[in-house]
Amino acid sequence: MALLWLLSVFLLVPGTQGTEDGDMRLVNGASANEGRVEIFYRGRWGTVCDNLWNLLDAHVVCRALGYENATQALGRAAFGPGKGPIMLDEVECTGTESSLASCRSLGWMVSRCGHEKDAGVVCSNDTTGLHILDLSGELSDALGQIFDSQQGCDLFIQVTGQGYEDLSLCAHTLILRTNPEAQALWQVVGSSVIMRVDAECMPVVRDFLRYFYSRRIEVSMSSVKCLHKLASAYGATELQDYCGRLFATLLPQDPTFHTPLDLYAYARATGDSMLEDLCVQFLAWNFEPLTQSESWSAVPTTLIQALLPKSELAVSSELDLLKAVDQWSTETIASHEDIERLVEQVRFPMMLPQELFELQFNLSLYQDHQALFQRKTMQALEFHTVPVEVLAKYKGLNLTEDTYKPRLYTSSTWSSLVMASTWRAQRYEYNRYNQLYTYGYGSVARYNSYQSFQTPQHPSFLFKDKQISWSATYLPTMQSCWNYGFSCTSNELPVLGLTTSSYSNPTIGYENRVLILCGGYSVVDVTSFEGSKAPIPTALDTNSSKTPSLFPCASGAFSSFRVVIRPFYLTNSTDMV
């Protein structure tokens, strides 16, 4: 009887979805066939800007809502201004799309207008003749409640985890058979199955099994690893892929770094090279706050060995990097050989002569590795005191090696912070950032969308008194590009502009970068200057033509960017011949 009742549920209420991204509605009209256009995205309703809004776009809205066509495409908030986010701007439809979400636009929540420009439509009174009652959104909860009841089952599941009391659950084969992801369970011969899971994953097993019923599950920072592990073990490929995509989203949301380190260990244990590379990349861009966190002493040797060779590693200075390694070595168990391999990766030429001299007095590592430090210091002093053409001629140094190139140094010597927000927001973000991690970035009054600053021409001590002037600018509009003398196209905005008014040394080149900051403290992407401009990715993965940041920014927008100057010797320069 129970199985017959379950079957009737499936036959009467097909489908499992309620409101979805891209669903639309009309609001504030005098009748049902007119109103302000609102579209659903990520759990919220928002409006559409009237830039480029025309009858083809309005047709898409009206047809999706059951009307034959649109008679008017209205702008300037004809049905009153809306509230919440402006979801789409510069929409361009062909008229045949099923939703505005399928049309060309700037992307989700990327807009240059306010609610005074909300788009509206008037649809024809004629409908397609179809009137739909759709209660399918209730099915997911109904099926979930069937699992919660633990009644009328024909499959019994014993869940075991070391250190945990066994968990006894039951399921309904009929429901499981409708879900291909549950195949590993419903294909079991007999009426019972044993699930062996890690002890840490026992708390999420019930949610995992319920997902096979409701097709819905809440994934958090604390549960994503275990759900990914269970999905991988039991062939729930959609859940596995979803959790895999969430890793990049969740990594920046843990200022303690427990999650990135836990996921790195998980990736190493399971041989997941993509997740391992993702964790290493995030930790390299956020290396300095990692070294200042309580998690620093728990970082495994293999991870530090993966981080130190990277040029795109963000830290105040090379000296601070070496001090962090020194501190780590006193709080962890690492072999003499492992420590030597780590010190070999430190770029001694990027430290000034005075800093090199003081190492013998300030580092606990120095005495145990004195010969290595002396050799590396001599290499660095040659770099600082001998002109590049002489080094190339007599020493045969390969100046293209990473040891002679800077990393992403975030101190004021080599970088400047550019804001893209109001002064009030700047002050908030600055205070939040420096409460979490002290980088010594100086007074907040200096932080705005235009920055003039100076850096040495080159890290060599030979250039200590030779400064080069830079101007960095956040360019959100075509007007701002014209104001500051940049040539831009609307498709590339916003961008970061960088110019120099100083004479450039023909033996020196620059590989300058922009650190994209989310919430003022997490680096979620790094972009390169192509000529005088560096692209700014979108904060979220949208249907925009622009590339999203490698790690999504949950706030939906970036408010600060750190411009980093990276000089290097041009070894093929004619001045060196």
UniProtKB/Swiss-Prot annotation:
Free-text tissue specificity from the UniProt record: Detected in embryo, liver, spleen, kidney, lung, heart, intestine, thymus and lymph node.
List of glycosylated residues: N69, N125, N362, N398, N543, N572
* Protein name, as recorded: Galectin-3-binding protein
- The chain positions of domain SRCR read 24-124
Instruction: Read off the SMART domains from this record.
Output: BACK, BTB, SR
Name of a matching Pfam family: BACK
Q: What organism, scientifically named, is this protein from?
A: Mus musculus (Mouse)
Predominant location of this chain?
secreted
Q: Signal peptide span per the entry? A: 1-18
How does this polypeptide assemble, per the annotation? Homodimers and homomultimers. The multimers form ring-like structures with a diameter of 30-40 nm. Binds LGALS1 and LGALS3. Binds ITGB1, COL4A1, COL5A1, COL6A1, FN1 and NID. Interacts with PPIC (in vitro). The unglycosylated form interacts with PDE4DIP isoform 2/MMG8/SMYLE; this interaction may connect a pericentrosomal complex to the gamma-tubulin ring complex (gamma-TuRC) to promote microtubule assembly and acetylation.
Which residue numbers delimit the BACK domain? 260-360
* BTB domain: residues covered: 153-221
Induction text? Up-regulated by TNF and IFNG.
